[in-house]
């Protein structure tokens, strides 16, 4: 990556396809990709649920922000965790970045993807109404910092890929 360039940063609720699409675009374009959740798990040798359980959500949010700062100049594409905007520091940091792409999805589809997923501590044992409340509370923040929004339930991975490719070419960064 040219370190004078800004990475594409994927934001959005859990289960919207940030990791899948980020990896797909990176593979297709031979770009570097970092999934912040995976980066945290590898660096700290704990799963996200273990971090939540042992240290709490606020501790995890601090790690998430620290890792985002570490990765911002080393990756072409970054997939953030869905709750990264819960940290005021991370939110303000992201507000000052370029190329923030918000992946959104219908809550019913999200629920079917993440219901009972043991790797998602903020989704475990939640009803669809509880998950929808969390989803709605985060959407305003995603909207505030997003450069572009894609509805991942309306577009295929390849359609999102081509849209992102057009953005990459338009920014003439890669």
UniProtKB/Swiss-Prot annotation:
The keyword Transport does not apply. GO terms for biological process: amino acid biosynthetic process; aromatic amino acid family biosynthetic process; chorismate biosynthetic process. Its cofactor is Mg(2+). Binds 1 Mg(2+) ion per subunit. One of its GO terms (molecular function) is ATP binding. One of its GO terms (cellular component) is cytosol. It holds the Pfam family SKI. Monomer. This is Shikimate kinase. It comes from Staphylococcus aureus (strain MSSA476). The lineage of its organism: Bacteria, Bacillati, Bacillota, Bacilli, Bacillales.
């Amino acid at each position: 990556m040219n370190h004078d360039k800004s990475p594409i940063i994927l934001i959005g609720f859990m289960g919207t396809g940030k990791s899948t699409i980020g990896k797909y675009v990176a593979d297709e374009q031979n770009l570097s990709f970092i999934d912040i959740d995976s980066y945290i798990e590898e660096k700290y040798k704990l799963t996200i649920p273990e971090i939540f359980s042992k240290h709490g959500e606020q501790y995890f949010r601090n790690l998430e922000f620290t890792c985002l700062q570490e990765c911002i100049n080393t990756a072409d594409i970054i997939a953030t965790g869905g709750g990264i905007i819960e940290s005021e520091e991370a939110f303000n940091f992201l507000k000052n970045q370029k190329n923030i792409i918000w992946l959104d999805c219908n809550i019913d589809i999200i629920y079917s993807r993440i219901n009972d997923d043991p790797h998602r501590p903020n989704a475990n044992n939640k009803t669809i109404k509880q998950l929808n409340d969390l989803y709605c509370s985060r959407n305003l923040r995603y909207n505030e910092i997003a450069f572009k929004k894609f509805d991942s339930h309306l577009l295929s991975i390849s359609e999102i890929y081509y849209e992102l490719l057009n953005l990459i070419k338009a920014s003439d960064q890669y």
